[in-house]
């Protein structure tokens, strides 16, 4: 696809394409090796390395060839550590160098004339060099060389059999007289033969010498033997597993090949010492809950029956909610990846990369709430990712059709030509320039290149200029012209009307487009804005993502997709390789539908007041799900398998053959299971299984065909697919695009070679038209699923119902980082949107309570999905339960009768179990107590505000058809750090928790004053009520701090609420009259001074 083709706009009902031209450019060069070696400088003293006796550059270390001159080499051996400064390998003694302590014992090695047989020619360097070269740089006796005579090969004896194909370095040492002529002289290393027709010779030795002279029997020899034995055991183990070619050919790359055959990842179960006590306390807590509820139900409070009934109902609901949340954590696991093995298998140096291509999706809607600079940093981090350039394509979806986003992306593509080579040259992290230059670290650490400081300063200056240009575009966009925006060539911007515009595609960078400043190729960068027309349901973000799926299938069709929010940049450039360790693993990869990474955030205050990091969910719940069927999809930072998004069933797992007569005697089979096998034998022969594609007709279980039933790569497989699959059914399912339908049959990706770029561009415009999805399965069984504003839950749920599994990957360096809402109001609105999406799923046909039975969804995985759509309903009992303490303190009643010793035991046992469960959960997961406690606090804050409103809004939408508007969460800019934390924005979500706080404060004051007036007898029952009230206040404390805002700055709304509720409190105070002693007897009326 030509990157300079220009912006292409089109419509589904207009048979035309409009192309707006743009410009492009590129260039590059290399040097030579020999001159560089000749001028190599010693890394110790700075002098030239110089040449050795053979005329080649002097090499001190044969392991790493670290540049060291002869003088420094002699000094380090004599006075220094005697080791290479780089690889720490001990320097070996070279010819002509003085001996030092620690050199290996060699007979006569100090006598050059006797060692090399110079015969008086020790001053002839040419003779010495030729002798050493013929000896393969070994310590042989050059003078003993005789004219070459082939020596009969003496193979090793292995298990009593002769093996003739053993490589030379594995032959045994043999005396020189073996071979009838001793053509090998007294050499102790094999002779190098240039003629391949000459048989390989055995290693000869002098029988008059002791074997220790050749290294046999020494400590070093024993260590080598132990290492060799371990290697043989490892090779034997791999051989038993049936992997590879084990003919003993002695290939030098064999260790690397062994490593490449190893698994690319492995599961790391939580140690039993940490997880078993956790499981035990869960079981104990269940038992204690049973006894606790038995007591609560059997001992009602007669004088406060309503309070007792409400509390019991709430407690039962909390217990059920805890069970739904707890049991998916029963089998938590962690995972490790091996990037070196991935490279050895799929990305060998000097060979074309075999890594799978990946399409990156970035979605944005409103540049006023999602700053273009934030989006630009995300795109730059993608373009500079550590992955083969030809395998990366980045698609940016602009669902707001904003010219500001288009122009910012154009500037980003130009800056990428400088930024991408800088990142890859110096291997910096992270590769989003805004966050890289904000790092408060010593950037000189571990950077030895002298040019790094200079180039970093120049790059920072270029980035500041880039920011100025982006901010200028933002400032210009604040004033919209009356006639609308126009492009540089004078044509009107096609997206002036956000709700009525054609589809637009612009390829900024690509394989044939602009190159970077060093002349290297850049990844493809494509701008996409789908068509919008009045009267069509565009399905918000889910519809935009499905449009990107179709466009990318037409233009690049990578088998894997990565979707990111515009404010989530790649923090670990090797994140995609981490995902490929699972996706491309030949053992487990075929059944993996997506790899989910945890969300990590920048710019959050140290205390994380509103639990923005959500550590408990990402480090506890998701690890638990990974041990079942995989984590749920959270909307960003996820690598998908394209075929799984197309609604295909997961490949069927081949079951191992059962133990039948192949491994048991015939008489055993006849006796033990004769009836069963006899019955099978008498049945009709099974018809031959045909490998075909099929569609399931059930509406709620209508995935496409199972990919596992197609043999990829078989002769004529593609022809069979096209012939077997009904074309009409495919078009009805995927839409009326023959190019796109054909791409869905390519499991390993790739575009159609017969299609021209012009035809692909036309198809790309067609598949993003607003009417393309009509009467298809898009949003129902294919792609991102419609029906909820939290499309991520539905999408992952449908994949798991098709039998796929997902993977949770937590690299040591966070893969992606994003921005989180800092102020209280934005955080509550974010939680409101999530909860509203769950309520919508609860009332839809895809509710996990009744959808997907009989499919591939596992039982505990269903528990998790049920919990994810039921949790907003917990807000109703939570609100009631948080109100009870204030009512109890104001009325003098309580939700429990007077406790007996047995009842106190159950109450104390339950509290201890709750406490110990939290401690053990933090212990096995590694979550800090601060994060765990913030999560508990915000569970109450969100429950009595956002979740409560989500339930009522969801009911209004279902029952009355009142739709709620989707609000994009504002992304952080580059203002003062944590300035948004103290910003107060009034919203109705603040009313319920504010009321709860004031009610409980009033209740505490009323209860204490009542106890003071009634004497010490009432203090005992008061402690239980006060504990109950303080439990509520402590959980709402972060909300109280957010409500007050900065010090000495109380919001007006708080003052108004305080006055209003103070008035109510005054009326209650008069009604309670706490200063009047309460008696059960008759009231005495004051009738004057003399009452008698």
Curated annotation (Swiss-Prot):
GO molecular function annotation: cellulose synthase (UDP-forming) activity; cellulose synthase activity; zinc ion binding
Cytoplasmic topology ranges: 1-280, 325-868, 923-937, 1009-1019, 1071-1092
Catalyzed reactions: [(1->4)-beta-D-glucosyl](n) + UDP-alpha-D-glucose = [(1->4)-beta-D-glucosyl](n+1) + UDP + H(+)
Superkingdom, taxonomy of origin: Eukaryota
Binding site for UDP-alpha-D-glucose: 363, 369-370, 399, 540
Sections of the chain in a coiled coil: 453-480
E.C. no: 2.4.1.12
Cofactor: Mn(2+); Zn(2+)
Lineage: Eukaryota, Viridiplantae, Streptophyta, Embryophyta, Tracheophyta
Cellular component per GO, a single term: plasma membrane
Transmembrane annotation, as ranges: 281-301, 304-324, 869-889, 902-922, 938-958, 988-1008, 1020-1040, 1050-1070
Region of interest (Disordered), ranges: 100-123
InterPro entries reported in the protein's UniProt record: Cellulose_synth, CES_Znf_RING, Nucleotide-diphossugar_trans, Znf_RING, Znf_RING/FYVE/PHD
An example Gene Ontology biological process: cellulose biosynthetic process
Record-listed Mn(2+) binding positions: 541, 565
Family as reported in the entry's similarity comment: Belongs to the glycosyltransferase 2 family. Plant cellulose synthase subfamily.
Membrane topology (Extracellular): 302-303, 890-901, 959-987, 1041-1049
Membrane topology of the entry: Multi-pass membrane protein
Residue spans of biased composition, Acidic residues class: 103-116
Cellular compartment(s): Cell membrane
Protein name, UniProt field: Probable cellulose synthase A catalytic subunit 6 [UDP-forming]
Organism in which the protein naturally occurs: Oryza sativa subsp. japonica
Residues reported in the UniProt entry to bind Zn(2+) 2: 61, 64, 84, 87
Pathway listed: Glycan metabolism; plant cellulose biosynthesis
Cofactor note: Binds 2 Zn(2+) ions per subunit.
UniProt entry keywords in alphabetical sequence: Cell membrane, Cell wall biogenesis/degradation, Cellulose biosynthesis, Coiled coil, Glycosyltransferase, Manganese, Membrane, Metal-binding, Transferase, Transmembrane, Transmembrane helix, Zinc, Zinc-finger
Active-site residues per Swiss-Prot or TrEMBL entry: 399, 792
Stored Gene3D superfamilies: Spore Coat Polysaccharide Biosynthesis Protein SpsA, Chain A, Zinc/RING finger domain, C3HC4 (zinc finger)
């Amino acid at each position: 696809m030509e990157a300079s083709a220009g912006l292409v706009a089109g419509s589904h009902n207009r048979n035309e394409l409009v192309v707006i031209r743009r410009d492009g450019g590129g260039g590059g060069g290399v040097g030579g090796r020999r001159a560089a070696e000749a001028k190599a400088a010693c890394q110790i003293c700075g002098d030239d390395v110089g040449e050795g006796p053979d005329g080649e550059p002097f090499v001190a270390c044969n392991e790493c060839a670290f540049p060291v001159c002869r003088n420094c080499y002699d000094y380090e051996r004599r006075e220094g550590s005697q080791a290479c400064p780089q690889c720490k390998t001990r320097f070996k003694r070279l010819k002509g160098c003085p001996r030092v302590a620690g050199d290996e014992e060699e007979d006569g090695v100090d006598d050059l004339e006797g060692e090399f047989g110079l015969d008086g020619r020790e001053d002839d360097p040419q003779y010495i060099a030729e002798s050493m070269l013929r000896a393969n740089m070994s310590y042989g006796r050059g003078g003993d060389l005789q004219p070459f005579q082939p020596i009969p090969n003496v193979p090793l004896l292995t298990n009593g059999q002769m093996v003739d194909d053993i490589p030379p370095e594995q032959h045994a040492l043999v005396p020189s007289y073996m071979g009838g002529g001793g053509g090998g002289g007294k050499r102790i290393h094999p002779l190098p033969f240039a003629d391949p027709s000459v048989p390989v010779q055995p290693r000869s030795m002098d029988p008059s010498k002791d074997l220790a002279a050749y290294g046999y029997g020494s400590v070093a020899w024993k260590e080598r033997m132990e290492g060799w034995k371990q290697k043989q055991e490892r090779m034997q183990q791999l051989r038993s597993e049936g992997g590879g070619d084990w003919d003993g050919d002695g290939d030098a790359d064999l260790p690397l090949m062994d490593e490449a055959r190893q698994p690319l990842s492995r599961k790391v179960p939580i140690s039993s010492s940490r997880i078993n006590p956790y499981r035990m306390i869960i079981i104990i807590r269940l038992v204690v809950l049973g006894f606790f509820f038995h007591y609560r139900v059997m001992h009602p409070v007669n004088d406060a029956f309503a309070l007792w009934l409400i509390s019991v109902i709430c407690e039962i609901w909390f217990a059920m909610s805890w069970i739904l949340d707890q049991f998916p954590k029963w089998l938590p696991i962690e995972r490790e990846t091996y990037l070196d093995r991935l490279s050895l298998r799929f990305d060998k140096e000097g060979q074309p990369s075999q890594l799978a291509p990946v399409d990156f999706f970035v979605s944005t809607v409103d540049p006023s709430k999602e700053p273009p600079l934030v989006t630009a940093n995300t795109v730059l981090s993608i373009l500079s990712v550590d992955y083969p350039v030809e395998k990366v394509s980045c698609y940016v979806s602009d669902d707001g059709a904003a010219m500001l986003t288009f122009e910012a992306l154009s500037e980003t593509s130009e800056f990428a030509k400088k930024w991408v080579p800088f990142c890859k040259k110096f291997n910096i992290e992270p590769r989003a320039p805004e966050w890289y230059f904000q790092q408060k670290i010593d950037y000189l650490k571990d950077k030895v290149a002298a040019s790094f400081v200079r180039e970093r300063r120049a790059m920072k200056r270029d980035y500041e200029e880039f920011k100025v240009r982006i901010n200028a575009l933002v400032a210009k966009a604040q004033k919209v012209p009356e006639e609308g925006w126009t492009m540089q060539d004078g044509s009107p911007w096609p997206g002036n009307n956000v709700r009525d515009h054609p589809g637009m595609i612009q390829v900024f960078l690509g394989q044939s487009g602009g190159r970077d400043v060093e002349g290297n190729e850049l990844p493809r960068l494509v701008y996409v804005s789908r068509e919008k027309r009045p009267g069509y349901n565009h399905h918000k973000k889910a519809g935009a993502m499905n449009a990107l799926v179709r466009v990318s299938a037409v233009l690049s069709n990578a088998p894997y997709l990565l979707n990111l929010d515009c404010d989530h940049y790649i923090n670990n450039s090797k994140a995609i390789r981490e995902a490929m360790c699972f996706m491309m693993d030949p053992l487990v990869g075929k059944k993996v539908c997506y790899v989910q990474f945890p969300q990590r955030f920048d710019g959050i205050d140290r205390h994380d007041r509103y639990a923005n990091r959500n550590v408990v969910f990402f480090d506890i719940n998701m690890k638990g799900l990974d041990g079942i069927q995989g984590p749920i999809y959270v909307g960003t930072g996820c690598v998908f398998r394209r075929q799984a998004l197309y609604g295909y069933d997961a490949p069927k797992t081949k079951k191992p053959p059962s133990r039948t007569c192949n491994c048991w005697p015939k008489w055993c089979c006849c006796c033990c299971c004769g009836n069963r096998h006899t019955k099978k034998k008498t049945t009709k022969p099974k018809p031959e299984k045909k490998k075909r594609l099929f569609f399931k007709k059930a509406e709620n279980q209508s995935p496409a065909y199972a990919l596992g039933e197609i043999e990829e790569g078989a002769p004529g497989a593609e022809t069979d697919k096209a012939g077997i699959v009904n074309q009409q059914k495919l078009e009805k399912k995927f839409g009326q695009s023959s190019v796109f339908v054909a791409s869905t049959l390519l499991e390993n990706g790739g575009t159609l070679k017969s299609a021209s770029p012009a035809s692909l561009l036309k198809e790309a415009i067609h598949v993003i038209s607003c009417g393309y999805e009509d009467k298809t399965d898009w949003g129902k069984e294919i792609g991102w699923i419609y029906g909820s504003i939290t499309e991520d839950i539905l999408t992952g749920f449908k994949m798991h119902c098709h039998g796929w599994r997902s993977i949770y990957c937590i690299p040591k360096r966070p893969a992606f980082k994003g921005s989180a809402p800092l102020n209280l109001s934005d955080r509550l609105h974010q939680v409101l949107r999530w909860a509203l999406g769950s309520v919508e799923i609860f009332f839809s046909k895809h509710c996990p309570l009744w959808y997907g039975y009989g499919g591939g969804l596992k039982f505990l995985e269903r528990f998790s999905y049920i919990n994810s759509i039921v949790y907003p309903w917990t807000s109703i009992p939570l609100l009631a339960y948080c109100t009870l303490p204030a009512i109890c303190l104001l009325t003098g009643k309580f939700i429990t009768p007077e406790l007996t010793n047995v009842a106190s035991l159950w109450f104390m046992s339950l509290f201890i179990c709750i406490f110990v469960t939290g401690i053990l959960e933090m212990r096995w997961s590694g979550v800090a107590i601060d994060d765990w406690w913030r999560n508990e606090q915000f569970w109450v804050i969100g429950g009595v505000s956002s979740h409560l409103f989500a339930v009522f809004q969801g009911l209004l939408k279902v029952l009355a058809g009142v739709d709620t508007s989707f609000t994009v969460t504002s992304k952080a800019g580059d203002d003062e750090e944590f300035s948004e934390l103290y910003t107060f924005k009034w919203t109705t979500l603040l009313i319920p928790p504010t009321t709860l706080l004031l009610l409980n404060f009033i209740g505490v004051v009323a209860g204490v004053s009542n106890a003071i007036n009634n004497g010490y007898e009432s203090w005992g029952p008061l402690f239980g009520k006060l504990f109950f009230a303080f439990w509520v206040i402590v959980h709402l404390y972060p909300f109280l701090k957010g409500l007050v805002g900065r010090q000495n700055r109380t919001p007006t709304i708080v003052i108004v609420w305080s006055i209003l509720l103070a008035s109510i409190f005054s009326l209650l105070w008069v009604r309670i009259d706490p200063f009047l002693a309460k008696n059960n007897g008759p009231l005495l009326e004051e009738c004057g001074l003399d009452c008698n």
